[in-house]
Amino acid sequence: NVCQSRSISLRLELCEENPVVSIDTSLFEQVIINIIKNSAESIGENGEIIIRTSASPLMLEIGDTGQGISKEVEAKLFSPFFSTKPNGQGIGLIFIREVLMKHDCTFSLRPYPDGITRFRICF
């Protein structure tokens, strides 16, 4: 587990409602794994990943206390083959974008003033 090996804590803030969403669960599982992996890599060591859900609006949000995202990087995040990682291929966020668009989700990835970078998915 990438989080355990880096001393990263996971905090769950899940809504009490249990909404039903029609999605390809295997694709969404991979989306969530990719987002959490990116968060862990951004944090490095000793940080926190927060997974939050809400029912109204129906939303999944994954936030992290990592290094954040500059405005320059934010503008390029979903560009093919763009990566901030030394050996990154720049296809992870492209895959995520394609899955979310296929499911008619809206999404954003940006830093917030509280120091947490959030990937927000609205269904």
Language model segments and positions:
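Core catalytic ATP-binding domain of two-component histidine kinases
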Residues: N1-F123
